[in-house]
Curated annotation (Swiss-Prot):
PROSITE patterns for this protein: ATP_P_PHORIBOSYLTR
Keyword Zinc in annotation: no
GO biological process, one term: L-histidine biosynthetic process
Broad class of where this protein is predominantly found: cytoplasm
A cellular component annotation (GO) from this entry: cytoplasm
Reaction it catalyzes: 1-(5-phospho-beta-D-ribosyl)-ATP + diphosphate = 5-phospho-alpha-D-ribose 1-diphosphate + ATP
Gene3D superfamilies documented for this protein: 3.30.70.120, Periplasmic binding protein-like II
Entry protein name: ATP phosphoribosyltransferase
UniProt cofactor(s): Mg(2+)
Source organism phylogeny: Bacteria, Pseudomonadati, Pseudomonadota, Gammaproteobacteria, Enterobacterales
The protein's Enzyme Commission number: 2.4.2.17
Function: Catalyzes the condensation of ATP and 5-phosphoribose 1-diphosphate to form N'-(5'-phosphoribosyl)-ATP (PR-ATP). Has a crucial role in the pathway because the rate of histidine biosynthesis seems to be controlled primarily by regulation of HisG enzymatic activity.
Length: 299
């Protein structure tokens, strides 16, 4: 019998989101020994258990209340949701937050020599996909009649194998499509990884753990999106320098020893600092510009 006060998190055992999910928990300070041959791993320093499962099992485990939380791609989540709605199965969940990894899109692609004007060009096509419900929802909204060919893997080879006229599959860079003589013609669904939670009663002890975890996740993601900036700036150009940098809070201004015309400025910037911005800072007389990564951040 498992401890009902320990929070159970389902995450992908192997695949696209696995390493990033593990990295997120590690950055949140959760000490856990994750061995791929085990179904469940236990955190040493927090009452958290991690279930390592197939990604398409995660939404169902959360919706059925088997686990408390799940880290899953929105594409997998929405596909399972549509399936459960069609079958009158339990389908309730709460999205706690979108995460900053697992970014991809579900797209329609056709052989490079297939004519294409707009979405109506796919009328009566046989389309291979691992996401039949998302595909149907999209094409139904466009009043496109089509035939679905369900494949659980290697969808991109379906046209060459004579199984389909087009495919609907996940795309990150498009390199796989190009390697198989395909071109992307329409985005069906854009996806990130997300953290989801079961609905229904969650006891106080678990809520405290979940709230603590959410605070840490927010801090980790905020830190990834931010940089710590240090520079020296002319006093008479200070406002212009500050206007170039979008800070989480107002900057810290310090006097420089033996220099009444320049100050040191420290701040957390909430935007990526591009070379162009650094060059503008330099043109305003800023010097000793340092841009540092932030490991952890709590506002």
């Amino acid at each position: 019998m498992f401890n009902t006060n320990r929070v159970r998190i389902a995450m992908q055992k192997t695949g696209r989101l696995s390493s990033e999910s593990i990295k997120l928990l590690t950055c949140c300070g959760i000490k856990i020994n994750l061995k791929q041959q085990k179904l469940i791993a236990f955190a040493e320093n927090m009452p958290i258990d991690v279930m390592l499962v197939r990604d398409d099992d995660i939404p169902g485990l959360v919706m059925d209340g088997v686990v408390d939380l799940g880290i899953v791609g929105e594409n997998v989540l929405q596909e399972e949701l549509l399936h459960r709605i069609s079958q009158n199965l339990e389908n309730s969940y709460i999205t706690l937050r979108r995460l900053d990894f697992g970014i991809c899109r579900l797209s329609l692609a056709i052989p490079i020599n297939t004519p294409y004007v707009d979405i109506t060009s796919l009328k009566n096509f046989r389309i291979a996909t691992s996401y039949p419900h998302l595909l149907k929802k999209y094409l139904d909204s466009k009043n496109i009649v089509f035939k679905s060919c369900m494949l659980n893997g290697s969808v991109e080879v379906a046209p060459r194998a004579g199984l389909a006229d087009a495919i609907c599959d996940l795309v990150s860079t498009g390199a796989t499509l190009e390697a198989n003589g395909l071109r992307e013609v329409q985005v069906v669904f854009r996806s990130h990884a997300c953290l989801i939670c079961k609905t229904g009663n969650i006891n106080f002890a678990k809520k405290e753990v979940i709230n603590k975890l959410m605070t840490r996740i927010k801090g980790v993601i905020k830190a990834r999106e931010s940089k710590y900036i240090m520079l020296h700036a002319p006093v008479n150009k200070l406002e212009e320098v500050i206007s170039l940098l979008h800070g989480a809070e107002k900057p810290t201004i310090l006097k420089l020893a033996g220099d009444d015309h320049r100050v040191a400025m420290h701040m957390v910037s909430s935007e990526t600092l591009f070379w162009e911005t650094m060059e503008k800072l330099k043109s305003l007389g800023a010097s000793s510009i340092l841009v540092l990564p932030i490991e952890k951040m709590m506002e």
